[in-house]
Amino acid sequence: MRTLQKLTGLRLPEKTVFWLVLAVLVLMLAPMLLVAQYNVPCADDYHFGAPTHAAWQATHSLASVVQAACGKVAERYVNWQGTYSAMFLMALQPAVFGNGFYALVPFLTLGALAAGTCFFCLSLFTRLLGTGRWQALVLALVWLGIDTQLLPSAVQGFYWYNGAVFYTFFFGVQLFYFGVLARYLAAGQA
């Protein structure tokens, strides 16, 4: 935070800077989340979600839905490619349970991205590089702002479930993994 002080002449506590940056990020994300209510399934959502939707309509059993998702993965194993964990999640797209649930897609993907980014930054910067917690969180929020605002296609990255789960959600999961690696490396240095 000394750099901020040098650039602006302001001397703000790190916690205050965090809350200011968080407020800016919330303002940036608010329009993205407000339009989520208009989000509807499209394209591959129907293909991957058809068996699970049929299972839900017939039984209203989560076990049957998961079984249908596993069946979709098995079908793709024989006929297509090897992104099985992604295909399992694609078969569980929210509209399987009703079109109104599709509005949750940007919340799920942004949530995974935000959680992964914050965990990674906290792990890397505080555990491995020795910075303060508030500094690491400010870096995470700035990174999250850049990720969300400069994405080439917000529709494919946050709103279209199959694209968002395949890329954005798994990127968030990957950041968790890198955070665990950073913590592992930091524990080895002790």
Where are the regions that the model predicts?
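Short hydrophobic alpha-helices at membrane interfaces in multi-pass membrane enzymes
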Residues: 183-190
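Membrane-interfacial loop-to-transmembrane alpha-helix junctions, especially the N-terminal start
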Residues: 14-19, 77, 128-140, 190
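Transmembrane-helix motifs of polytopic, lipid-linked glycan transferases
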Residues: 108-133, 176
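Transmembrane alpha-helices of multi-pass, membrane-embedded glycan-processing enzymes
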Residues: 90-93, 105-117, 166, 170-173
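Short hydrophobic/aromatic helix or loop-helix immediately within or flanking a transmembrane segment
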Residues: 74-107
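Extracytoplasmic loop-helix module adjacent to an early transmembrane segment
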Residues: 30-80, 90-92
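Membrane-interface micro-motifs in multi-pass membrane enzymes
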Residues: 44, 132-183
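Start-transfer (signal-anchor) and selected internal transmembrane alpha helices
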Residues: 1-29
